[in-house]
Amino acid sequence: MDHAITPEPHLVPGYTGHCAQNRDRVGRTYGRQTHKLLIDPCIYHAPELIVAPIHAKRGLKDYPTEQELKILRTREGLVDSVYRHPILPGYAGFVPNKVSQIGKRYVAAASAGVARHETLMELYRCENRTLRHRDLLESGNGLFDRKINERLLPQTYYRSPLILVTGVSKGIKDETCPPKTEKLCYSKFTSPHFLEDEDADKFIINGYSGHIPMSVTRFGESNKVLTNRALCSFSDYMYKRKRDTWCCGQDLSRPSITCPPVGHFVVYHEDSGMVPNYAGHVPGETYKFGRTYAKTTYDAKRWLEVHKNLTVLPEVANLDYAY
């Protein structure tokens, strides 16, 4: 019977952790071999067990605290809460303030993040209630006697709402200033294409995979400088087109803008051929051979002018390749 039961302590077969000097011993089963190694005083062991005991105390980073649970229960009673305790691991949605909770289990980190968010929102709501209560007291519309703590609130000498007073009523002469164009109030959701040229945020961030107007012909610059100049050229060209279309409503406060040079947007140049890695279409390039790619694509648009009256397929036509 003693040989049927492995004595304690021993490691269960299938344990994938480290056991000192186990790989140097042979001839016994895993359980008996680890039993000999664990009780051998000549073998250096760790001062404490790696695996925590079953009856170990619950750590602060393993489970949410009582204060956090109280905040979550109060929140569920006030609003239709999406985040209900416990927030199970595997939830792929957004959890507020979860990123700042480091070294905790998912349930503890998510509960702490939501509790912190609810505490901050409660401070905002308390401040909002204080401001509304103070405005009600200052306006004189309250039908109740002010308490001691209400008397300590900061007050002004004026009753709200205030009455607008012009400069003439004060005896001050109005200054005649030329009309100014109001600057558009841009928000953080405004596209950088329509920001002012002087705006520091008028550029495209790295990783943007959409079309950036007038950026094809620019190179050798950083992404911020390149996209800023491209967007400035685009907005200038857009205002130029608007002025040409609506001459009566042109904005005279902006300097005159000229159309960008057409040479920047020419694909087939008359004095040079295409680069060998160009993967686009070149007119007549399929029916030419015996020359380099640059010589073949030299002045490519001339092929269309020479064969503009072509009525049959180029394969069966008597084409002129001598140009």
Curated annotation (Swiss-Prot):
Compartmental location: Cytoplasm, Cytoskeleton, Cilium axoneme
Top-level taxon of the source organism: Eukaryota
Keyword match Cytoplasm: yes
GO cellular component terms, semicolon-separated: cell projection; cytoplasm; microtubule cytoskeleton
Record key words, sorted: Cell projection, Cytoplasm, Cytoskeleton
Pfam family, one: CMI2B-like
Cytoplasm among keywords: yes
InterPro entries: CMI2A-C-like_dom
Described purpose of this protein according to its UniProt entry: Probable microtubule inner protein (MIP) part of the dynein-decorated doublet microtubules (DMTs) in cilium axoneme.
Similarity annotation: Belongs to the CIMIP2 family.
PANTHER family given in the database record: CAT EYE SYNDROME CRITICAL REGION PROTEIN 6, PROTEIN FAM166B
Protein name, per record: CIMIP2 protein CG18335
Organism: Drosophila melanogaster (Fruit fly)
The organism's taxonomic lineage, starting at the top: Eukaryota, Metazoa, Ecdysozoa, Arthropoda, Hexapoda
